Structures are given as C-alpha cells and as structure tokens.
Regions:
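A helix-coil-helix interface module used to build multimeric assemblies
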Residues: 1-216, 220-234
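Short, intrinsically disordered, charge-balanced linker/junction segments flanking boundaries
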Residues: 236-240
Length: 240
C-alpha cells in the first residue's frame, strides 16, 4: 500500500494529520535525525571553544557554516543518513559519518573530523535530541496555541460578564450565575496548568557511556568534564 491518510498505521499520521501536521517538524523521524545532527554539531563547536589542543586550529569563522548543516537540513540530507545507516545498521553512527562527509565538503576540516562524537555514547545524543525536540515543540507550537485559547476565552468572559444563566448542582437546577464567570473558571484553570507545565524541567542525559565522562577523563584529565557537560547542555541546548 502507498502511504496516505487512509493507509497510515497510526491515526496521528492518518485521520488526525491535519491537526498534528505542525508537530512533524519536531517528532517525525526526519526531525529526530535533524536534532541529532544539531547536537553533534554544537558539541563539536563546544569542544573547539574549550579548546582541546588538537582543535585550536579550527577557525571560529567556520562555526556558523557548521550550524548551517542543521539549519538548512533537508529531506535529501536525511535520506543520505538513512543510506549510511543501511550499511552501519546504527542510526547515530550514520549521523556521525554524514557529518564527516559534510566536513570533507568544507575543506580544511579533515584533521578535525574525528572529534565529531568524541567520547560520547549514542544515548548522549538521543537523550539530548529528544528533550530538545520536546522543548522546541512546546515553545513554538503548544504554548502559543494554549495562550491564544486562553486569550480568546478571556475575551468571551469579559464580553459575557453580565449574561445570567442557571447554574446546577448534582445535575439539578440551583442558584443563578453569570456566563462570563463560568468561562473565567476555565481561564483560571488553564493558566494554572500552563504555568505548571512551563515549570517542569526539561532534562538531558549527557556524560559518556556510564555517565562518568570516562573516555573524556582518560584522554584529557586536565579538564573539568562535568562542568563542561553541564555548560554544554544548559547554554547550547537550553536543557537541564
């Protein structure tokens, strides 16, 4: 079968695609691959900023060019990563090899490309990419729509402030109330729930195979890798 709205396995991608389409940029496989590329690129840049001794020669002017790899990430790029994965049988390793190809295209980066993914395990990439996708989906799609809903309900509550209506208790007619007040109840509830959601920390896992930066410490014991990891996650990804 050809994939369309009727043949999709999940109703999220089928029946309700019109409602969920905006989330494809955050939760599709294409999006996950793109976020993995972003994390790998930002990690490499952060190593250069440290800098590691072997990365002192990297021109800072190339950083924005490197960022354009994920900013301009295309379906063709994702397709290339899937081609590499068909050989590696490893999705994150395929991202690393793709980035090495992109470094080759830039020229002058051949001596540095082995530091892509230096000291990391796959879950360092997955457990930063996925919360980053959740963070950006909330900030760019979910929060704005909920805030728009709250604003519209508030408008109705003010417009209908003096419209009387019969209230009920236990399903039975009771004392009167006002329509605007009842709508305002939902404004209040939504505002509290939105504030609670925004207060939830979006956390990442980052620290090597077992969370101890073992490979990092063996290679470069003079650096504070725990501080490096915390700074990378907080400043470059906006996570905790």
């Amino acid at each position: 079968m050809e994939l369309d709205l009727l043949t999709a396995i999940s109703p999220i991608d089928g029946r309700y695609r019109g409602k969920t389409d905006a989330l494809a940029a955050y939760f599709s496989e294409f999006a996950l691959i793109k976020y993995r590329v972003q994390v790998e690129v930002e990690y490499f840049i952060t190593l250069c900023e440290l800098p590691l001794p072997q990365l002192k020669g990297v021109d800072k002017g190339v950083f924005e060019t490197l960022r354009n790899i994920y900013r301009n990430f295309s379906e063709a790029d994702a397709g290339r990563i899937k081609e590499i994965e068909s050989v590696t049988n490893h999705d994150v390793k395929a991202v690393e090899y793709f980035l090495k190809e992109e470094f080759d295209k830039l020229g002058g980066m051949d001596d540095y490309k082995e530091f892509i993914h230096f000291g990391l395990t796959s879950q360092d990439i997955n457990n930063t990419s996925i919360p980053l996708s959740v963070k950006e989906a909330l900030e760019q799609v979910y929060y704005p729509q909920i805030e728009e809903l709250i604003a519209q309900l508030r408008t109705y509550a003010e417009e209908w402030a003096n419209i009387p209506m019969l209230a009920k208790t236990h399903g039975q007619p009771a004392s009167p109330t006002r329509l605007g007040k009842e709508v305002m109840v939902f404004v209040y509830r939504l505002e509290r729930q939105l504030a609670a959601l925004k207060a939830c920390p979006l956390t990442a896992k980052f620290g090597g195979a077992t969370g101890n930066y073992n490979a990092h410490h063996v290679a470069y014991p003079e650096y504070d890798w725990k501080a490096f990891g915390n700074r990378f996650v907080a400043e470059k990804l906006g996570l905790e």
